[in-house]
Structures are given as structure tokens and as C-alpha cells.
Amino acid sequence: ILAELGLEPATHSTQIVEPEFMADFVHALISTFGVLANLADDMRHLQRTEIAEVAEEFAAEQVGSSTMPHKRNPWNFENVKSMWKAFTPRMQTIYADQICEHQRDLSNSASQRFIPEILVALVSVTLRLNRIMSRLVTDAERMRANLALTEGMVTAEPAYILLAAYGHPDAHEAVRRITLEAERTGRPLGEVLFASAELRPWLERFTPQQREIVLNPARYTGIAAQKARGVCAVWEKRLGLA
């Protein structure tokens, strides 16, 4: 059976197998649970009214709230987080089971019977997330609107990096002052930046692509999309999904 599971027998044991093997295994389960709960919590917050960039798909007759007919609560994502909160504390019990008096008492005989529930819970939330994420509704227009809220402030980072790369002696401070001016006047950061006579000697060296990144925050993505696809490809191959 061990061979079929890709496992090896312990190098030594008493009347019991060393409990550290189980502790490491369950820790991996709980750690995975945390990753899924973090994803669920991110999606849950992105569904809030003031953000509203994503949403769980709702059927025509589905009820989102028992008291507010208009609501579409992210109840599936909330379920995943709730399950994580319920099962994460069980890791403490697993650690406690490492202590076995004289390597053979029965103080873990009851507590270890609940370990399969952790596996069942993890499989359950995985299936739930697979189902919900495959039907996730995204709002690109809302994403663009949220990005525009700060009038391009996010491009302060590439602006100061480029200025420094072209030799400005204190690019961070220079851009910090530009952001203050942009906030005071309500003008986009890129507009204020490229209107600066003080910074013109360095700004003139920007390539068209670099200027576009500073003027258009939506272009400031680097290789994020490429990396995301790469990570997905790696795990699809490892999990036999490719």
C-alpha cells in the first residue's frame, strides 16, 4: 500500500509510527486550506458594492439575502473562509498528538479520529471554488473606473524608477513633490509630471513606450499576464490537467 501511494516506511518505530509524519501531512493540508481561503476572501472583498469588480454568478431565481431582496451576497466565498476558520485550529490538536507518553499511551486515540474530516473539508472547498471561479462574473468597466480614481497616482512608481535610471539624483523625492501637486490641483499625475520644467532634461529621454506607461496606468502591468499564464501552465502540467 505504501508503494502504491509513493510512500516509504519509517526508518524506525516503536509500537507506533512517529507522529511527525502525520503532523507534516496535516500542516500541508491546513496550509493549502489557507491559500484557498485567501483567494476566497479576495474575491469576497472584490464583490463589495464600493469595489464591485467581480461577482458570483446568480441564477434568475436565486436569493442572496433573507432580508434584503436586492442583495447578492458572496455566500460561496464566505463559506470557504468559514470552513477555513473552523478547521485551522485543529492543527493545534495534531501538534498536541506528537506527545505520546513512553511512545505508547492512548491520549491521541480519540483526537486522531477527526483527521479525515480535514481532508473532506479541503476537498469540499476545492470543489466549491472550482465551480464558482469557473462561473465568476467580471466587470472590466468597473475595474477601469476604479483604476482611474487616483488620477494615475499608481504610475508614480515607474516614473521615479525611470527618472533614477536616467540619472536623476533624487528621483523619489522629485516624484513625491509631483504627487502633492497633482493632489492639490486635481490633475492627473502624468500631466503634472511632463509639465515640469525642472524634470524636463530627464523626461526628454523617456522612450515613447515609457511615456505611455507613465501617462496610462492601464499599461503598467509589466510581465504580470505572462507570469500568471506561466504559473498556471506549470501547475496544469503538475496536476495532469494540461
Segments predicted by a language model, with ranges:
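Internal glycine-rich alpha/beta core junctions
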Residues: 1-97
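Glycine-rich cofactor/substrate-binding loops
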Residues: 68-242
